[in-house]
Every structure is written in C-alpha cells, then in structure tokens.
Amino acid sequence: MKQIALLVVVLSLSVVAESLGGRLSAEELSSLPYSQSLNFDFGPGKVAPGYTQVLQTTTYSKELGYGFEPGADVTCVDRGGRDALRSDLCTSDQPFFFSVALPEGNYEVTITFGDQSAETVTTVKAELRRLMLEEVRTAAGKFTTRSFTVNVRTPQISSGGEVKLKDREKTSELWAWDEKLTLEFNNERPSISAIEIVKVTAPTLFLLGDSTVCDQPLEPYNSWGQMLTRFFRPGIAIANHAESGESLRSSLSARRLDKVLSLMKPGDYLFIQYGHNDEKEKGEGVGAYTTYKASLKHFVEEARKCGGIPVLITPVQRRTFDAQGKITNSHGDYPAAVRQVAKEENVPLIDLHAMSGVLYEAWGPEASKRSFAPNDGTHHNNYGSYELARCIIEAIKANKLGLAKYLITSTAPFDPAHPDPVDSFNVPASPQVTAVKPPGS
C-alpha cells in the first residue's frame, strides 16, 4: 500500500486536471496527500475549474481509478447556464454506484445535489451499505451540498501481516477492503452534480463485534453498526471492523483487534459488542465469567495502551418471547459478565441487551417480526437496525461520552419503549439481495 505524505495546506488539483484534459490517472488518485481534494464534475456540460469530468460512459477500472460501477444505468444531462458545476448532472430512476481508488484513511466527502429542471431525492450509502445521508431533497432549480466523513480500509497491518479475511470478505464483502471508496446513490430520483473528496485526520470510532454489528453486504440483512453513521455529522469517521460469526477469541485470532490498534490514535473510541458466538464456545474453563471476561479485559487494556477510549456493549437480544409477550434472556450469563467488566475496569457501558428487550416488547411478538430478516430471530433488517442504532445514540448521550459532540443535533430523542412506526421508515433497500443467512445466530 502506498503511503501518503502529510501536507498541512490545502492543495488544488486544477493544474493536474487541466494538464490531463480533466482526467486524473489511477496512480495520481492513489498517492494523494492529506488535505488535497479530488473534485468530480458530473455531466456533459462545461467542466468547472479544478474538477474532473464524469460522463455516463465513465466506468470504473483500476487503470482509470474512478467511475461508475459496472451495471450503472445513469443519464447525464446538461441543462445549460453559466454555473459549470450546477448546470449539468447525472441521475437515474434506480440505484447506482460510483467508486474512487483511495488509500486507507478517513475522508470528508462533500456532494452537490440538485437539478435545474426537476425535483431530486437522494439517499447516500458508502462501502457496504453504511447509511451516510438518509434523504436529501431538492426542489426544481434548487441545489444543496451535504458532507460526511467516511473510513476506507485495507487488510494490511502496519506492523506486518494482515487481517485473516473470510471467504465472504473476498467476494460479497470485498468493497470493505478493496482500496477504494464506493458510494451508493439511491431513492426516488438520485441526482448528483459534484463530489469533492479530501483526506482528513478526523478521530475514529472503531467497532468490533459480530453479525449484529458488522456491515452486512446484502439485503435484507443489516446491523446497527452500518446505520450508526447516519447520526454523526462530519468530523468523525466510523470504522466498522465487526464481522459475522465472530467471537472475542476468533476476532483476536483473525487479527481484527491488531488491525484496529495499528490505526488507533489517542482519543479514538472502540465500541466492543460480542456474545452471540462466544456463548457457543465449548471447552474446559470456557465461559462467561472466565474466558469471555478475560478477553473483554484484554480488548479494553489494549485499546487504553493506544490512548483509545473503550466502550463495552452488552449483546443485543434475540427475538425470544415467552407466553406472556416478554423477552426471555437467550444469552445466559454473558450480558452480566459485560456489566461486571465495565464496573471492574471503569469502562462506559451501553446496555443494549436491556434496551433491545424494551424495544422488542414495545413491538410485541408479532409486530417485532417486521424488524428482523425473514424467518430469523437474530439478524435485523434495515428498520430494526436503524431503531437499534437510535438506542446506541441515546446511550452515547446518557453516558456523556466525548464523541456526543459529533452527533447531529437535529435528531429527536428516542425512547425504545416508543419506537418509530415501521410505516414511516423510508430508507430504500440496496439492490444486492441474498437468501443466505449471515454466519452466527
């Protein structure tokens, strides 16, 4: 992986872009210094100074280093006018993807939305369906810009070696590890006029956990980790290193913790939620109050050595109701063990086990099915994971964590006893679908 030189000033790409006729090479894309912006002007009209033109025929390749992912059915039009950036756009009536080759790191992405002649409605997701912008609406003739901070990662570990990826991480989950940023544009009429990307030294919130936390690649599965991004303003990146089927010990063996620690800076956060798969481990001395607690303490200690701030999260409940419509604990002693470690090590605790129980009971045995994937009592759909992410946000505020200053202030308070109506949920599904359950249960 090419290393990026640190610059302390913002550099313009106008000279490079103009010298190449508005086109950047893949090599230049992959060797950008901090604070140097990549600017893309979408549409066939006049290209704004310092921007690279993107046409509907601009298909991503390693050689080019940017473009629409294969299969994109987009229309790029020029409306005319003096404003080169806003006079043209690319749009579609179905989801499409745009990728840029980028080195590992945190990036601030700014997107210009709008159309001189029509209303636009756009939802933006990044990498493996991380929800970045829920719904951006513009009236005909109006434009708006929105920004977010996103993390791009690779398997390589700076001290040597790499994360031991599972087979699915090399196929359906490859966008999480492929040295490029992929953006999904979705909703009724997604339309974009410009994208600006700049590498930043923003703090990072790292996530480690299992299938209920990770970035699920395919519909109808989803996790709270990939919905959490929607509730943070620019200035902090969320790096989700959770993976389906993982326990604390298997994540350690796969070097996922090593990867996080190699990137962690003082003041970064590490949210840790395991249990679903740990409770299935067998062997002499294996259990909630032995190996599980010891592993939790190890994760906490290692994060603190790097100046990181660990936060423990109890495992989310499964959909297990009794005859009275109450949730039964399917995790045994594991939630209590997390609470013990939090108390013993003076670590902030997010009791998602308790909050999700309140949430499920508010829905009830039948209505709660609408928050899970079909025939699955463990893995959530988009709506269910969105509501769980709202639980996490409320716990961040209740714990008075420092990263609360990065939360979007317009988000209304949330009470899991009174969840959002499912019929009002409007995050569109991504186009990739599977009938295969994620590993773990």
Language model features with spans:
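Compositionally biased, intrinsically disordered or flexible polar/acidic segments
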Residues: 20-219
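Bacterial N-terminal signal peptides
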Residues: 5-18
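N-terminal pre-domain segments of enzymes
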Residues: 24-35, 46, 409, 413-423, ...
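Alpha-helical cap/lid subdomain in secreted, periplasmic
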Residues: 255-409, 428-441
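Conserved beta-strand scaffold positions in the cores of enzyme catalytic domains, especially
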Residues: 39, 238-240, 346-349
